[in-house]
Amino acid sequence: MSTDKSVTQDLILTLEDGKAGFAKAGEKAAEAGNPEVAGYFYELSSQREGFAKELVEMAADYGDETEEHGSLGGAIHRGWMTIKDAIGGSSVAAVLDVAVQGEAHAVKLFEEALAEDISPDLRRVVVRQLAEVRTAAQRVLALQSMNA
């Protein structure tokens, strides 16, 4: 597997995890009565879906096939969110705590992707997406502080 294909596949899985995780977090925030946080989580879910589609299309242009099913780590993270909800309820603060962890993980994976020997075209996309993921991570941290 080429480095571009491997990196692209890893990022697509991470982004699919984010899409699903933020959709679930949006549901939990809505149930907890916080439409602002819920709306932002739904926005991030849509953003991650768009990022994944961009990478899938880029890979297809190069003749690579990719999977869009999410990773085992992401499934575990979403499972952890479900367990945490069962134990600690579905408070916005609890959901934000999990979202902060998820965003830190996403930033780390994007940074690791940039450490790889990837093509200039893929690097440009990853740099741009990482900047937006970092911005989202900062906003999630700010929301966490406001809802503590």
Give, region by region, the residue ranges found by the protein language model.
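Surface-exposed helix-capping loop/turn segments at secondary-structure junctions
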Residues: 31, 61-62, 119-120
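A structural signal for well-ordered alpha-helices, especially hydrophobic packing surfaces
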Residues: 19, 26, 52, 59, ...
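Preference for long, well-ordered alpha-helical segments
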Residues: 95, 99-148
